């Protein structure tokens, strides 16, 4: 994903298309048909960005309860800590009385989100 893709996905049109795709399961059997429909409505690059994000969000639903609101890259999702694991870690920080946490190399921020949910002050840093 590049910056232009991200901007498009956050635009009203991109959000609307993502919402449409969220309502239908994307499978290997439907993938090509959905891609063709999207390319009839938007530029090929935009269609690819929407389809890729919809697929990633569908996979991410196994890890994140709010996947439909999040933005993913394939690598980021594969490396992301699932919510239950992140919540367990965050609870341990809270129980230890840790007030501020620096999550260096945070990736998409699964651990940072869980830490923040426990009231920790979080500084999340990643190079990309």
Predicted feature residues:
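SAM-dependent transferase fold signal centered on methyltransferase-like domains
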Residues: 1-128
